[in-house]
Amino acid sequence: MSSTELPETRTAASPATRSRAVRVADGEELRSVALPGLTLTVRARPGTTAGLAPALYVHGLGGSSQNWSALMPLVSDLVDGEALDLPGFGDSPPPDDADYSVTGHARAVIRYLDAAGRGPVHLVGNSLGGAVSTRVAAVRPDLVRTLTLISPALPELRAQKSAWPTALLAVPGVAGLFARLTREWTAEQRVRGVLSLCYGDPRQVTDEGFRHAVEEMERRLELPYFWDAMARSSRGIVDAYTLGGQHGLWRQAERVLAPTLLVYGGRDQLVSYRMAHRAAATFRGSRLLTLPEAGHVAMMEYPEQVAAALRELITDAADVTSAEGGS
């Protein structure tokens, strides 16, 4: 289970309901992409030269495209990067059909890639985004050059106790109850709670980083649909965990053809470190990076190490493609 950032909120797509502006780092570009029944915010980090292969980054539950701002510039000489705000998260409004299932999120990613004509991409997912990316890679291998999964939310027989509160959000009524019980919590309190849950060592966060996180939390607290998006997405993860047969996530992981990098943190309180070896055995020919001091968001905690492993994956895959006479 996963929860990269806490309360975020806002209504549908009407510009009149939007709150304060979302932060955009130097070198990033933010745009809105309208699809039938769906509007997605895309955070772009253009490659340093023209013609680079495209990459797409997919965040986790409660997260946003900002989760990739530390990693994207470290590989911008290698890929032309874009990070999505999944429907109902970040600066993307809820989907018209209110489908927050893993399949629904995967469908949003596929629809964006098809509409943009960017595939195949180097697909990178964290947590819920890892489950979504696994499903995309399994059902649409033509869209994926390589797959990188950072603490992917894949089913566990014994979920860690620290992940139970996230699962409880899936129970009808619990999200509303939690919202009422925590109404008096400040943005600072919420951010500290998120950091203690998601980081291996919250002291790594700089004062500036903490301030930006608080500002983003304040923005989200002004939005009216956060708890519904969180509850429905949490329910979507639980449903995906219990789904069997050909649609089960582990079964789909076996079908992934793209070269795969798996990243796990030794201090992850949401996705168990012990799942690393099962994942490595399931994704064919995969490589594994374990970071003993990392928590649930290694790309934010140790971006240099993750970038180095991602760079190696992409370079090796390109070498194989060239040797086979591909493009």
Give residue ranges: language-model regions.
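Alpha/beta-hydrolase fold catalytic core
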Residues: M1-A55, S76-D80, R107, R118-G119, ...
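Conserved HGGG/HGGXW glycine-rich cap/lid loop of the alpha/beta-hydrolase fold
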Residues: L38, A44-P93, M300
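Conserved acidic catalytic loop of the alpha/beta-hydrolase fold
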Residues: T103-V121
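Flexible "cap/lid" loop of the alpha/beta hydrolase fold
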Residues: A138, T146-E184
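Conserved alpha/beta-hydrolase catalytic His-Asp/Glu region
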Residues: E184-Q252
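Acidic catalytic loop of the alpha/beta-hydrolase fold
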Residues: L243-G244, R267-V271
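Short beta-strand/loop motif that positions the catalytic acidic residue
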Residues: V256, L262-Y264
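Catalytic active-site module of serine/aspartate enzymes centered on a nucleophile-bearing elbow/loop
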Residues: T282-S327
